[in-house]
């Protein structure tokens, strides 16, 4: 469960459940301190976000303890996923720049 308490983001969930009819499809939503929306990312979905404002504060509520070793990263600008992040010149982390494309992703779900 994610929520923005300051600023705003575009938040994205990608279905990575191999047997799902919506496998590879994504849903995006704007979360902001003004709209106070929360977004549930269920198991079997990849999660990403792009901050739309400086000094954005983003909170997470997790169902399990965070396990960095299990984290895998999809390429943020993957052509197959075709996600509109709503930003023209994003600042992208090295980890996200070196992620794998969806076509080569092997899902654990």
What function would you assign to each model-found segment?
Residues 1-34, 52-109:
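Active-site region of the double-stranded beta-helix
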Residues 32-49:
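Conserved SET/PR-domain catalytic core that frames the SAM/AdoMet-binding pocket
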């Amino acid at each position: 469960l994610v929520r923005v308490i300051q600023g705003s983001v575009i938040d994205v969930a990608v279905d990575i459940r191999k047997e799902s009819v919506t496998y590879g499809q994504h849903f995006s939503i704007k979360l902001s301190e003004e709209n106070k929306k929360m977004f549930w990312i269920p198991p079997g979905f990849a999660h990403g976000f792009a901050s739309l404002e400086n000094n954005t504060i983003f909170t997470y509520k997790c169902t399990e303890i965070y396990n960095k070793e299990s984290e895998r990263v999809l390429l943020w600008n993957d052509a197959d996923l075709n996600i509109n992040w709503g930003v023209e010149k994003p600042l992208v982390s090295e980890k996200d720049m070196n992620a794998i494309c969806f076509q080569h992703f092997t899902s654990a779900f």
